[in-house]
Amino acid sequence: MTRKEAEKELIAMLKEAEGGPTYSMEEVDAYMRELLHPKNQIYLTGDTHGQFERIISLCERQQVQPESTFIILGDAGLNYYGDRRDNRGKDKLAKIPITFFCIHGNHEMRPSKELGYQVKEYHGGKVWVQPEYPNLAFAIDGEIYDFFGYSCIVIGGAYSVDKYYRLARGYNWFEDEQPSDEIKEKVERVLSARDWKIDVVLSHTCPLRYEPTEVFLPMIDQSSVDKSTEQWLDTIESRLHYERWYCGHYHTDKEIDKIRFMFQDYALLPHQISLSAESAPSRR
């Protein structure tokens, strides 16, 4: 039973009760429990970079149910090395009986068949999954996922401002860190087919006009930073009718307009709204 279904049943009970039918306390209690403590919560947080202690602690405190999903908005730190060293983090999350849904960041490899991944269906879209870690789902850019009635498009990737620092010291840097032209075309094609209406955007970086300049690193010359992904997201955001936009990347927690930047904070994807083609508001 979803929270939306529980709410619907309770409303129906109240309406019918006006005409005489009665319901047992057990029936009412079951629906109330689902409303107050839903099993299918959708959690969100920002970059973890392989440090999962805070997520594990939250799951234990909240007694997160197996039906729940935990979205990490990029740079989860699970595909950094491309070898067995990545299994340390995967093993930790495998012990938590929920699904972790990871957006692609800029400090990690894109999953592939060469890394032992398989493409599977998940909430109406496609994800990469390793058979050894079935509860770790890696989102594919441009796919739309249905999280309990919410249409969510994923747009991962960003530019690494520490690119040359990494290259100079032999640290990993990934050439395909930003969305390719093919990915951009897919995103635009998918959104166009939906008349540019979506409930939620899940991205790693943000549209250019929303960049949190207050957290820019002072030693980085911003004129040398490739902002092509942010510029492109600007064009997407200006055309898109959406309810919420969640992103990570900047290691800050803040909210402006409908966009929420996430790092160590947590959010729950609401259950009660859905932006249909008929009810979508005009934002521009």
For the regions a protein language model found, what residue spans apply to each?
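Active-site neighborhood of phospho(di)ester-bond hydrolases with catalytic His/Asp-centered motifs
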Residues: 44-46, 70-75, 100-107, 139-140, ...
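Beta-strand-turn-beta hairpins that frame and shape the catalytic cleft
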Residues: 34-43, 144-154, 200, 256-260
